[in-house]
Amino acid sequence: MSAQDFLVELGTEELPPKTLVSLADAFLAGIEKGLSGAGLTYSAKQVYAAPRRLAVLITALATQQPDRSVNLDGPPRQAAFDADGNPTQAALGFAKKCGVDLSEIDQSGPKLRYSQTILGKPTTSLLPTIVEDSLNDLPIAKRMRWGARKEEFVRPTQWLVMLFGDQVVDCTILAQSAGRHSRGHRFHHPQDVRISSPAGYLSDLRAAHVLADFNERRQIISKRVDELATQQEGTAIVPPSLLDEVAGLVEWPVPLVCSFEERFLEVPQEALITTMQDNQKYFCLLDAEGKLLPRFITVANIESKDPAQIVAGNEKVVRPRLTDAEFFFKQDKKQKLETFNDRLKNVVFQAQLGSVFDKAERVSKLAAYIAPRIGGDAQRAARAGLLSKCDLSSEMVGEFPEMQGIAGYYYAKADGEPEDVALALNEQYMPRGAGAELPTTLTGAAVAIADKLDTLVGIFGIGMLPTGSKDPYALRRAALGILRILIEKKLDLNLVETVKFAVTQFGAKIKPAGLAEQVLDFIFDRLRARYEDEGVDVAVYLSVRALQPASALDFDQRVQAVQAFRKLPQAAALAAVNKRVSNLLSKAEGSIAQTVEPKYFDNANEFSLYSAIQQADHAVQPMAAERQYSESLARLAMLREPVDAFFEAVMVNAEDANVRANRYALLSRLRGLFLGVADISLLG
């Protein structure tokens, strides 16, 4: 079957840069779906996106649908004809439905059947609907109308190119009649651009100063920004999201170096970086020590004959932004950080839980409780907790919300607070996302855990549990943050006692009955997803969860040990034995004796297992004390042979009550050894 290349380009006013890639990808996906549904084959696909256009190129697209054979089954033969062989209404109705005479219906089988061949339609007749459906299905949060037209799209449309081979596909979509003329760069080439063929699309636009390939523009910007940064003896800060956004703003990227006055460097560099990145879409430069340089890179959308004019314009625009940041910083520093707490008494944290100041006081007490239990200083943690929310009422954070915690750090430093106290004001929000940085100080870790735990206990205490996708207080993230800090920083904190202490801080504001258990279950349940992401089988998690360790670090150490144990050749058999023993013990009548009496042994294999258990117990006790769980399970794996021999030769439920009870006690000792690490019966 013959094939031709197909190109569709929709020209628009400037598209939202942050959603440009997702719109383009959805456009391609919609066209792929339409082609697949129509049975049209092709060899390759490519999507293009620029500020004023979305385009899709399909290579070697079939020029026509394949013919299709369709079989329609009708009524059973005995229902289609009466005793005299005359057609019934069922037969006549089926023929009418098929649009043919009854004589054209196949009557040889058990049912009447009509077979027909549906000729494939020309691809050109199908493309308009496929393209239109794809555009209508784009994930556009809010569509707009323009002029007096009824059509709706994310931005007003300007032109439409649709070529199949070298021929225009005749159609009108979103108020635009298809043609072969695109448009060049708004300034360098404002005239129409004739697209010679689908394959020539990129080169035709390149000649008109338009780089239609988003990835090409992104690579050019990234490479040139790095080159310019090196020339300035610095390193560019290039967040992927900012790079994507800038690539979505320009058709012909030209990065240029600009500068600002060095006096602005007295302002916290995070504030300067925030305003330059978020408001101006600039790439900031750092020196070898990570300090902000008084220079930045802007990406122009024009190759100017006088670049200095563009540089001067950007420097003029950024100056008021930096001046604002400087003003807020100086205003805030006119008073001590602690005095900002008074303003927080009138700021509601949560209606039932009090003000932000109330929260800061609770965090202070809880951090002081946590700090010495993880090796930190209670007084410094209490101080950091008390100051933790002060900067929320500062001018700086009011203008730049991203500066919360960071501003507090700088103001605390200026007030002469200890370094770890100042750092804790920023570290309280860590980790700020999945895989993000953790606190570096014990004071910061204590405040971070306290802040998150206070939120968890408080919100759970008033019954506002997260449901489905709704988690307005980010409780899942808070729980995961606590776990990451404790596990990755190797902090051995008893969460059971800590949560109970946190509950006492709220007084009558919450309902304490069963609250601590509910919060603990929520926190430890988050570990399940964490381990699944790491490739740990859920059975391993459940085997440790059954023991309900109080420490997240201890929990993790047990999980790692069980994970290693599962790789041992004896693991499966011992897991099965533990399951068997668990079932036997659960059915035992009365209480099981705590001690084993060798005098009741009547089989050599009982003596062998008892001796092996005694030796194993003696070996693993010091391991358990040091939480050497992997070593402990490896030692217990040596019990497989005496255990197997025992079950092969010994009937546990002996007729003699004393012998039977003694065997239950022996098996209880065996199971107890493994339960020192995990319930491995759940691994089977």
UniProtKB/Swiss-Prot annotation:
Its main location: cytoplasm. The keyword Ligase applies. Keywords: Aminoacyl-tRNA synthetase, ATP-binding, Cytoplasm, Ligase, Nucleotide-binding, Protein biosynthesis. GO terms for biological process: arginyl-tRNA aminoacylation; glycyl-tRNA aminoacylation. HAMAP family: Gly_tRNA_synth_beta. NCBIfam families: glyS. This is Glycine--tRNA ligase beta subunit. The gene is glyS.
